[in-house]
């Protein structure tokens, strides 16, 4: 088992902490933007570890991580830096790492717990990617989304709302408390809902087929040795 398999598990753990612990605490004021940014940075670095087995992929992801961290921390510490650029870089990072992680999960061989966790991490990365895409649209076209009670949300607070909205859309729950009004926003929502329907079915079928292929190969090897 390669070290990158352990990287998949580490990526999932950090994603889960960021999404389900740090993000809500940051929204209610218990964990500040510094803590949220720190865990986001750790998640970015773990993404590099998760793809470290492929040098070219690790280099590309490393450049993305360095760019995203520079823009994010420059904005946090000095107030400089574009929030739109930060969102775009984070979106690209999530998409690229999700694609590389899935390639790792679907490679030949036994399906380990680490690879299953990698598949879950890829699913969470897709949800995060769309959250950043929604944030970008909302920043470029104010009013693209309608929030509960028609209240106005500050730019810095958009991402917490869109993380929630993204995963509600991805799991096709659709509570309807946040509504997409801009055509581009609606298109993104439709695409994410389709991914939410297709991803689990395709993932399960592929993992089962890989495990069966591996078992058949083991049986064939035993027969040859016997």
Residue ranges of model-derived segments:
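Central hydrophobic cores of alpha-helical transmembrane segments in multi-pass inner-membrane proteins
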Residues: 16-19, 37-49, 96-99
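Outer-pore turret/helix-boundary of cation channels
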Residues: 25-28, 127-164
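Pore-domain transmembrane helices of cation channels
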Residues: 97-143
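Pore domain of cation channels
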Residues: 156-218
């Amino acid at each position: 088992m390669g070290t990158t398999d352990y990287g998949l598990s580490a990526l999932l753990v950090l994603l889960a902490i960021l999404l389900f612990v740090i993000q809500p605490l940051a929204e209610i004021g218990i964990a500040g933007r510094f803590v949220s940014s720190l865990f986001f940075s750790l998640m970015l670095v773990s993404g590099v570890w998760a793809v470290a087995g492929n040098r070219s992929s690790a280099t590309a992801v490393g450049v993305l991580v360095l760019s995203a961290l520079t823009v994010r921390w420059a904005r946090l510490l000095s107030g400089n830096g574009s929030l739109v650029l930060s969102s775009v870089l984070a979106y690209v990072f999530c998409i690229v790492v999700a694609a590389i992680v899935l390639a790792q999960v679907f490679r030949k061989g036994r399906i380990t717990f680490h690879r299953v966790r990698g598949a879950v991490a890829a699913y969470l990365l897709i949800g995060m990617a769309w959250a950043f895409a929604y944030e970008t649209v909302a920043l470029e076209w104010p009013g693209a989304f309608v929030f509960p009670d028609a209240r106005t949300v500050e730019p810095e607070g958009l991402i917490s709302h869109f993380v929630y909205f993204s995963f509600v859309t991805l799991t096709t729950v659709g509570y309807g408390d946040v509504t997409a009004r801009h055509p581009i926003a609606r298109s993104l929502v439709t695409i994410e809902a389709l991914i939410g329907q297709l991803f689990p079915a395709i993932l399960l079928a592929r993992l089962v087929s890989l495990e069966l292929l591996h078992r058949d190969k083991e049986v064939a090897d035993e027969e040859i040795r016997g």
